[in-house]
Amino acid sequence: MGSRCLFCFADGFKGQRFKWARANNRSGAVLALEAASLLGDRVTKLYLYEPPFIINDSRKPVPADYVQQLNSLTEAGKRSEAVEYFVSEALGIPDEFIGYMKADPSWNKMKDLSHTLAYDGLIMGTTQSGKPLPTNRWVVNAPTLIMTGENSEPLFHDAAQALVKLLPKAAIHTLGGQDHSAVITAPEVLAKTVVDFEL
């Protein structure tokens, strides 16, 4: 699922230089950081929206055996249970709301993709463990804009503050009136920020 979260703009012929943007939720931020680390100077700018890192007690961390549990559920054919485990443990959705989610037609689509949820967990690695971010995982020298929504949960603001300390050319920009759903509800706001903001 994470591979859909990443897109690039070619800057020059033959895609020799890139501006990477994390355009969706979950592991897309990590994929963008990994790409920028691997491509080095070929990445000219990096844009991230609310990396969902859990680096303190602002939210319950994802269990250490999270990926193993997801795999066990999907291998047993318990696709709905796997999705429920994902939204509960990884997304932090309270139990009282999960029933409403199951009643939505999108739940069946999530069930069909439930075998990919473990990939997302593998990409996220230890970034949702409640511990500080690894200091040597990403070497990104490109100017980086980390966007957050004004009304988002504290964990997203804490994650942005932690990440900006690790990247030498990073800055945080808060989008007024937005929350974590802005990638769906206000994509034009994010797009304008990416276009207008100079790093």
Give the label of every model feature segment.
Residues 1-2, 23, 30, 82, ...:
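Structured catalytic cores of enzymes that bind and process phosphorylated ligands/cofactors
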Residues 1-23, 27, 192:
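Active-site loop/oxyanion-hole signature of alpha/beta-hydrolase fold enzymes
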Residues 159, 183-198:
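Post-His helix in hydrolase/transferase enzymes
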Residues 5-11, 69, 81, 85, ...:
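Alpha-helical elements of Rossmann-like donor-binding domains used by nucleotide-donor carbohydrate transfer enzymes
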Residues 34-41, 165, 192, 196:
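Short, well-ordered alpha-helices that flank and scaffold nucleotide-derived cofactor binding pockets
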Residues 51, 55-108, 119-125:
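Helix-rich cap/lid subdomain of alpha/beta-hydrolase
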Residues 106-166, 171-177, 182:
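Conserved serine/cysteine hydrolase catalytic core
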Residues 15-60:
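Conserved hydrolase catalytic core segment
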